[in-house]
Amino acid sequence: MALLDFFLSRKKSTANIAKERLQIIVAERRRSDAEPHYLPQLRKDILEVICKYVQIDPEMVTVQLEQKDGDISILELNVTLPEAEESK
């Protein structure tokens, strides 16, 4: 039957193929552009709290928000702390 299905199946039109590809591109773009408006302020607030306790370069703090499967969000915070100064 598979051989019969192969010969009798209709091929997708180029318009349908283009539509599917465009939907994939739009979905990918929505995921990548989905950075919330509050993320820069959140980064600034976190940096201020860290600076209360440790002298740090602002470039050493990165905050990223990753969304998976539409309903799961992962907030990733990377802080490179300076090496501890030795007591003399």
Swiss-Prot record:
The protein's matches in Gene3D superfamilies, at most eight in alphabetical order, are given as:
Cell division topological specificity factor MinE
Q: Which Gene Ontology cellular component annotation is one that this UniProt entry carries?
A: plasma membrane
Q: Which InterPro entries match?
A: MinE (IPR005527), MinE_sf (IPR036707)
Q: Give the family per the record.
A: Belongs to the MinE family.
Please name the gene that encodes this protein.
minE
State whether keyword Cell cycle applies.
yes
The protein's matches in NCBIfam families, at most eight in alphabetical order, are given as: minE (TIGR01215), PRK00296.1 (NF001422)
Q: Which SUPFAM superfamilies match?
A: Cell division protein MinE topological specificity domain
Alphabetic keyword roster:
Cell cycle, Cell division
User: What function does this protein fulfil?
Assistant: Prevents the cell division inhibition by proteins MinC and MinD at internal division sites while permitting inhibition at polar sites. This ensures cell division at the proper site by restricting the formation of a division septum at the midpoint of the long axis of the cell.
What's the protein called, per UniProt? Cell division topological specificity factor
Tell me one GO biological process term: division septum site selection
Is DNA damage set as a keyword in this record? Answer: no
